[in-house]
Structure formats: C-alpha cells, structure tokens
Amino acid sequence: MGALTKADLAEHLHAELGFSKREAKSMVEAFFEEIRSCLRENEQVKLSGFGNFDLRDKRERPGRNPKTGEEIPISARRVVTFRPGQKLKARVEDFDESKVVH
C-alpha cells in the first residue's frame, strides 16, 4: 500500500473533475498553503467530516542521548497535531480488507 501524494490529489482532480493539470496542481497547493497559513496565525483548522489540525505547545523536558546515555534537555517547541473526526474514524473502523484491489 503506497502513500497518497499531492501529485496524486492533483491527478484525481484532473481525471474526475476535468480541471487542467496546471489548475489541479494549483488548487492542491493553494489548499495546503491555506492550512499552513492558518496554523502560522495560530488558528485551528477544522475540516468537517475529516478532522482538526491544532497547535500544541510542549514544555522543555529531559531527554537522553540513546548512544551515550547522557541526559540532554529537549527544548520547548510548538507542534501540529491532528485529531480525526468521528466520520473519518468510523470509515477507517469499517474498513473491509477483502474489498481492496491488490
């Protein structure tokens, strides 16, 4: 099973909805840029029926160098989290392996 890429999304828009390849690529890029922009502005991104992208601030915490065992601090940082919505969770849970074309 492979990964879905932005190029795959653009190809789908081209094949299914009739957009030119250039338009489809631009639409995909604009979609992701809007998500990035909102997150940069500390806004939550809610995609109904899919899920939410949130920002979370993590405090500094102790860590350890796995090679030497030396304790080193892991610096405070902001991370992006994704919480799937109920509809997405239900679709994933109802997944039927027998229907997959290999």
Curated annotation (Swiss-Prot):
CDD domains membership: IHF_A (cd13835)
GO-annotated cellular components: cytosol
Keywords noted in UniProt: DNA recombination, DNA-binding, Transcription, Transcription regulation, Translation regulation
InterPro entries, alphabetized: Hist_DNA-bd, Histone-like_DNA-bd_CS, IHF-like_DNA-bd_dom_sf, IHF_alpha
Keyword rRNA-binding tagged: no
Biological processes per GO annotation: DNA recombination; positive regulation of metabolic process; regulation of DNA-templated transcription; regulation of translation
Coiled-coil ranges from the UniProt annotation: none
Keyword Magnesium: no
Classification via Gene3D superfamilies: IHF-like DNA-binding proteins
Subunit structure: Heterodimer of an alpha and a beta chain.
Protein family membership: Belongs to the bacterial histone-like protein family.
Function summary: This protein is one of the two subunits of integration host factor, a specific DNA-binding protein that functions in genetic recombination as well as in transcriptional and translational control.
Protein name (Swiss-Prot/TrEMBL): Integration host factor subunit alpha
Gene, per the UniProt record: ihfA
